[in-house]
């Protein structure tokens, strides 16, 4: 077991390091487009929240106090839920007999996460994008799931949640993939511009670097290309001598990693810019599907094929995760006036440190909770990936029709001007995580439209953004504290109470109180 853990740890480290490096260098050429040229057009909810924390800390006074109070409220609220189970983390229409009957008989159920952090995220995203995202959830949960539940055999034994995983989520995957391809086509000019700059610098021609203002100065394209080539060379060695052992299959695997990571980097950045959520699991699932099909076509299947596909998917997944997170860092830097080149350089060190530690974390989680068996970590995305790979590698059914439906829907949405990526994210992410975004968006709309004085409305909206940022920061911080306590063996969770109807009703009441607190506190704002 120890040798196996060490072997897996080495694989995790290399996947994380190579994927992280690719994510950084493939995003840098697109920094200016997402951060500068699209300034004011994307909400960047996570970047906004973090920037509010930094700015309020710099200003001090009332803003810092307000942020600290909001962080304490949001953090304490989420902490007592995750650590003690004081009330349920989410409520659903099953809370009453009629709702339970609708869920069991008609497969219609509505869920709502009651967390403070998600409420704050919805406030920052705003009503427009929150509504589009939740519309995708409504289509799946209120049309697709009940419709499928009415025609499948033995429907009584299948829950709406299972129908969502089996039918709704694949439609979302198809939509995300097509929305990503549409985004790639639309951003072809940006891609060509980045490639043109690379060719120009590689040829030794002078660029306008000397006249570029400090806050727009990136690492040189020559250095970026050097890192790309070095990373691909290291991946070549890793695939050949650590995974595949066949040069033809190794070259194919390397091509898959580079092409998909390069193309979907812009999709990951776009998703983070809009909703603050990276659809990396959906894009990784598409990577696994494509890589599995290609690997099977060149004679690699079975367990060795699944292992190869997972390694390829792991590298791409890490690259897209890094790209999505890094665009947030760069946007924050743009707002506070940092030098992008310095951020980019230090990110390489951060990637190396993360790669060295993530393997240990994975091994500890496996030894503490396990990934299979009773009481194991749920790992829903990992289970979905396994379900995708197995039929492709070992023979079975793949939901191509559902992928196709999602892709066609994304094209239709694009043609009528609806952001297909946001809508598809709604189909992929569970309803209970999307519905609170609308609640937060409604709070933002309400507080910013009550006065006839535009200055008052702006002051209220800004104050609410600070409170929402506090909710997000406090919830995230206390979530880490709660996880550390659980890992240390502290078992303070009242499971029997947390699963009761009383806890669910209390959760609904506490959520309403949190919304009321946020709206009341925000409405107190006055223009400076």
Question: Where would I find each of the regions flagged by the language model?
Answer:
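Membrane-interface alpha-helices at helix entry/exit sites of multi-pass transporters
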Residues: 52, 56-69, 208-214, 337-349
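Membrane-interface capping segments at transmembrane-helix boundaries
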Residues: 187-192, 450-454, 518-528
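Membrane-embedded translocation segments of transport machinery
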Residues: 233-328, 334-335, 364, 376-379, ...
